Amino acid sequence: DDIISLGVGEPDFSTPWIIREEAFYHMEKGQTSYTSNWGLAELREEIAKYLARYNMSYSPKSEILVTVGVSEAVDAVLRSILNPGDEIIVCEPCYVSYQPLAQLCDVKLVHLDTSVNGFYPTASQIEDAITEKTKAIMLCSPSNPTGRMIPADELEKIAGVIKKHQIWCLSDEVYCELVYDGHKHVSIGSFPGMKDYTIVLNGFSKAFAMTGWRIGFIACSEELMAQIYKLHQYSTICAPIMSQFGAAEGLRNGWSEVEKMRVSYQQRRNLMYKAFNEMGLPT
């Protein structure tokens, strides 16, 4: 009873009121039906604006798909791009779902140990891991579970390797708003030529404290999205409409609440960092 678990990525904040209120409003109006398989148009438009903040351009009509959380997004993408016998590079340690979802596709997992380099993958490591059977690499920056960000200069080198070998890059960016000490998130999809190879995966669980709302999204090229859409359409149909309305309002007007939570997380992180150092633990 005296042990505090830090093992689950679950914000201890309630979803900001502005988001809950928006969802309540639409439920009270009786808007409780299916949405388009793509997701609400207003949400996709807000997502496109959001991605533009990170120097990425995606059409809300054909290159952005709303999903039931990022976990569904990962599953749908892997089943769209992988064939039995393919290889996928997974940077470890990693989010617990990556490997099982890849294994369900009957592919070979190539494990990349990032602990040898400060818990982020390097371009040279990735280059060495690529074979003629490599179909994709799974990146997560900031990392779950380590929190480590891939430095922008290294990320640019990784982009070069990906373009050279023409493999897919699944970029899980669900923690991108929770960065500290003045750092800014950089998406691998923002580098020249990377839109053709990058599949951006993101959602609202972490930044907006919306884990139970199950709302995420995929952004990628139109050609690939046409295939991912089919899997989504016939498996989950759409994310809950009230979650979509809430997420759209979060993107429009919820950023001050996100910042309050981020500041609190940074204060907690600093406290843990100080305590670990005082105990002589490596940080």
Question: What residue spans do the PLM features occupy?
Answer:
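N-terminal small-domain helix-loop-helix segment of the aminotransferase-like
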Residues: 1-69, 76, 250-253, 266, ...
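PLP-dependent aminotransferase class I/II
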Residues: 16, 197-283
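Short acidic capping loops at alpha-helix termini that bridge into adjacent secondary structure
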Residues: 58-64, 84-87, 133, 195-198
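Conserved PLP-anchoring active-site segment centered on the Schiff-base-forming lysine
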Residues: 80-102
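A short helix-loop-beta submotif of the ANL/AMP-binding
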Residues: 103-109
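Helix C-cap/helix->beta junction micro-motif
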Residues: 105, 164-165, 279
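Active-site phosphate-binding strand-loop segment of PLP-dependent enzymes
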Residues: 114-181
